[in-house]
Every structure is written in C-alpha cells, then in structure tokens.
C-alpha cells in the first residue's frame, strides 16, 4: 500500500525517536544519529516543497535551476524559522530548554572557551530535543507504551550483554563493563525500567496474564542484575524512588485498605533499614579485645613482630598495626604474585597496605604464614585493590557500609579522602562551597569550572590525590558554580514550571522520572555527559511534551 509524503515524514519521526530511545543503553553514536535523523526530518517537514517545484515547473531551464538554489536556502531558513515560532508558543518547553540558554550566557564570564564550546556541544540536546518533540504531533497512549516497552527491551538486552561480559572478563572494577555508557547512567535506566514494569504489571486491563508474567520475570532479572553487578547506585536510587513514591501514593489513594497497606509497607521498610544500618555500624565499631601485655614477639619463623599499640585503627574489629612482619610478607608475597609488594595495585593503591588490611580483616597475623594461607583468588583480589574479604562478595550492603565507615575514620584521622568514594565527594562539595562563596552572583562561567576547581583545591591544600581532584559530583552545585545564584534558581524553575503548568506532577511516569533524576543529581553530575544529558532531555520531553494523555498515579476507582 502506497503511503503519502506526509505519512513518510511521520514514520521517519517515529523511527528516529525509536533510534534515540533504543540507543540510550548502548551507544553515543546511536544517540547522535537518532537526533540528527529527527532534526533532518523536522526540517524537511517544514520545507515548502510545493513552492520550489512550482518555480521549476514554470520554466525548466538552466537559469531557473540555478535560481532555485537561493530559493531553496530561503525556504530552508523559512522552515526553520517557522519551527522556532511554533516552539516559542510552547512556553513550558521553551522554559525547560532555557537551561541551554544559560550555558550560552555563561560564555560572558568564561576564559577557557575550548572547554566552554565542548560543554555546549554536550548540553545541546537540552535545546534540540524539546524543540523537536514539542513542535511535532503528539503520540497517543498506545504508541507511548510501545516506546516504553522498546526502552525496557533495550535495557534488558544491554544487561544481558553486560552479564556475559562479566562472566568472561576479569574486571578490576566491575563497573567498567558499561564503559561506553556510564554505569551510573545505566543504573538510572535500570531504575526507570523497573518502575515502568511495575506500572504495566499493576495496571489492570492493560496486559494479558501471561504478558504480566513475562514483565514480572524481566523485573526480577533487573533486580538480580543490580545485585550481581554491584550497582549500589541502582539499588540506592530504586530505594529512594520507592520511599518518595509510596507517600505520594498514600496521599493520592482513596482506598482505605490500600492506604493502610502502603503505610505499613513504608514503616516496615524504614524500620528494617534503620535496624540493619544500626547493626552494621555496631559491628564495624566493635573491637575484638586484645591484651597488649601478652602479645607474641616473634613469628613462627623466629622473626620479630612490630606492634604499634598506639594506633586504634581496626579492620572488621581487629587491630590493624599489631603482628606486623614486613620482611616475611614481602618475601612470601613475591612468590605468590607478579605485582611487587612495594608497588601499586590495579587501583593505584599501595599493595603492602592492601595486604595488611586484607589479612587483618580475616583476623590473621601479618607474616609469611598468612600470605601462604591465601587462596589464589584472594591473591587476585588483593592485586585488584580489594582490602577486605567482605568486599569480595558480589554484592554486600555490609561491605559498602564498612567501606564508607573506613573512609570516614581514615579521613577523620589523616584528612586524606583519597580511596573513599563518599569521602571524596565530601571534599568535592567542600571545594564547591568554597568556589560558590567567591562567585555566588555570576558564577565562574560555562568553561571555567575545571580551572576554578583546580585553584580551589590548591587553596584548600587538599590531600586528595591529583588524579582524583574532580568536580562537584552534584548537579545543583555545578549549576550554582557555573551561573551563580540567579542561574541556580532559574534551573530549579525550569525543572518545576513545565510539569506544574501542564499538571503532570500526578503523572506516574513523569513523577518517577523526576525522582530518579533529582536523586542522581544530588550525588552526581547527571547532565555533564552525552548519555546523561540525552537521558534527561529525551525522557523529560517525552513525558511532558510528546504524549496526548497522562497516566495518573491512581485511577479514580482505586
């Protein structure tokens, strides 16, 4: 069956949108191609072909063909202007895309224009995607669901690929499996997929029973993947989204039984989290008693131990700096590993210190006998920089909490946050506040953020390793640093005004997306990478500007 040109343009737009959504878990190139396809279709759709053809039909000569060239450029320019006029009438989309405008205005306060223009290229989807989606014909609910199924399928395929890669490769950091798409962004995609599946499973009449069973299997797999891939970000954002969403559901539902179940559910979750956390912290700070007056002075091989009884550092309740025999450990380690005892492990941390921590975590003495007792997989773990046997577990909440507490105690004693992800973030935030205090009105501009952080770290005399002196790892602080107080307030307004005026705060998909996005922005620079900004811009625009109908959190009969 033949299709009209208008239908082809529509199909091209829908296909381009599918390419963008399907590329999110896989490819930056796919994202770029999808956006270029959509932009090209958007321009062609507004090009006045009839006027161009009419000018050629009047008199088809070489001169008329040559004259059609400037006419084509005029029609191309006119079509783009027409599209922007449409865009200007859509105030919510225009205000959201104004986030990009602030990055342009930030050029007035910039000295590093190379980085500034790179940042503008990265952030361009914040302008492009709202422009293209808000000025195109909206999609109906059925088509929207198909796009969400496509998204879930893409995340499912990528999670399967990642699992296969994990099984055949030995990653120093398992998060490297998502190297072409940040593991943090992929965890956000996972979380959005999980809550999309929950919507389809619990929405009555939407799917057949066997289809819901299939969705439940995929949901179960995503949860298993989060655990096996050690995606602490994915688990945290999923949990935070639940803790925010449940009170909203409690407020929205008029069903007393449902309200009671939800209240009991959130109380159980919060109580369980509190008790678990308290137990982990107590266990971490529990110290196995030692009589320092009765410490053995020599190893089984007759070499003297070193005992630093003044140090209170522990690992799993065992004192770190007693029963140390460096020469024995060095000699025994060289027989077990190709990495030198006095060099750095694969995390660029001292091998000797990692060995001491690992052996202490098991309650062993630090001598040749202990090194010889290590299993080959434990030697491999130490080479990778794993300093506690608990951290070898595929996923360990206790290990993550111990890692944080260790970093906190070490930071408190030495002032050096290097090696602890959370303590490093505190140092990033401390530097961010310092920069803001000196540039709170205008900010440092679009391109000077790296220079500002470099100067601030020097000013603070930070003990952070030079290769770990990163930016704020908080999107709100990054905006404040770049554009000052007014830019920060406008950023918040740009996020909140569109859903407010469009009455979408009670839309399930947008609310879930907003919670996920804000959660990620509190602990990361979500829109500072191509995949991050594309995730943010495409779903914000899809949920607000592209759908004809919204999906309320609760139907009227619930």
Predicted segments, located by residue:
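Short, aromatic-rich membrane-interface segments at the entry and exit
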Residues: 13, 28-39, 116-119, 233-235, ...
């Amino acid at each position: 069956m033949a299709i009209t040109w208008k239908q082809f343009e529509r199909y091209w737009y829908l296909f381009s949108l599918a390419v963008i959504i399907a590329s999110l878990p896989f490819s930056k190139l796919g994202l770029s191609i999808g956006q270029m396809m959509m932009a090209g279709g958007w321009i062609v759709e507004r090009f006045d072909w009839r006027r161009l053809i009419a000018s050629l039909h009047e008199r088809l000569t070489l001169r008329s063909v040559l004259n059609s060239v400037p006419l084509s450029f005029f029609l191309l320019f006119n079509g783009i202007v027409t599209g922007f006029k449409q865009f200007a009438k859509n105030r919510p989309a225009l205000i959201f895309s104004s986030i990009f405008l602030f990055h342009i205005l930030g050029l007035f306060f910039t000295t590093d224009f190379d980085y500034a223009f790179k940042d503008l290229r990265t952030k361009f989807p914040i302008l492009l995607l709202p422009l293209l989606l808000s000025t195109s014909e909206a999609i109906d609910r059925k088509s929207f669901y198909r796009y969400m199924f496509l998204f879930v399928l893409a995340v499912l395929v990528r999670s399967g690929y990642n699992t296969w890669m994990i099984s055949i490769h030995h990653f120093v950091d398992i998060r490297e499996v998502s190297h072409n798409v940040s593991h943090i962004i992929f965890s956000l995609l996972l979380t959005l997929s999980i809550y999309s599946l929950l919507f389809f499973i619990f929405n009555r009449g939407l799917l057949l029973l066997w289809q819901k069973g299939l969705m439940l299997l995929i949901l179960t797999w995503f949860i298993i993947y989060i655990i096996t891939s050690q995606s602490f970000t994915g688990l945290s954002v999923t949990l935070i989204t639940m803790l925010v969403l449940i009170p909203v559901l409690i407020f929205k539902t008029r069903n007393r039984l449902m309200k009671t179940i939800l209240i009991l559910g959130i109380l159980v979750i919060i109580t369980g989290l509190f008790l678990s956390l308290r137990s982990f912290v107590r266990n971490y700070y529990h110290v196995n008693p030692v009589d320092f007056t009765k410490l053995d002075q020599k190893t089984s091989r007759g070499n003297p131990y070193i005992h630093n009884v003044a140090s209170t550092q522990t690992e799993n309740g065992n004192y770190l700096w007693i029963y140390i025999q460096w020469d024995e450990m060095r000699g025994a380690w060289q027989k077990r590993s190709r990495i030198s005892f006095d060099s750095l492990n694969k995390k660029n941390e001292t091998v000797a210190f990692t060995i001491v921590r690992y052996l202490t975590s098991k309650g062993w003495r630090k001598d040749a006998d202990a090194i010889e007792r290590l299993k080959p997989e434990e030697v491999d773990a130490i080479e990778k920089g794993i300093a506690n046997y608990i951290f070898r577990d595929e996923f360990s909440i206790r290990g993550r909490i111990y890692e944080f507490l260790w970093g906190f105690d070490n930071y408190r004693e030495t002032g050096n946050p290097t090696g602890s992800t959370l303590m490093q973030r505190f140092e990033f935030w401390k530097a961010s506040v310092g920069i803001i205090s000196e540039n709170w009105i205008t900010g440092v501009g679009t391109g000077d953020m790296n220079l500002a952080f470099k100067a601030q770290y020097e000013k603070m005399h930070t003990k952070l390793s030079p290769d770990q002196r990163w930016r704020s790892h908080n999107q709100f602080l990054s905006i404040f640093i770049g554009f000052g107080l007014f830019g920060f307030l406008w950023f918040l307004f740009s996020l909140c005004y569109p859903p407010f005026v469009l009455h979408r705060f009670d839309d399930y998909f947008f609310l879930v997306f907003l919670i996920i996005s804000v959660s990620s922005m509190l602990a990361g620079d979500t829109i500072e990478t191509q995949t991050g900004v594309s995730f943010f811009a495409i779903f914000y625009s899809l949920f607000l500007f592209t759908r004809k109908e919204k999906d309320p959190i609760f139907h009227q009969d619930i």
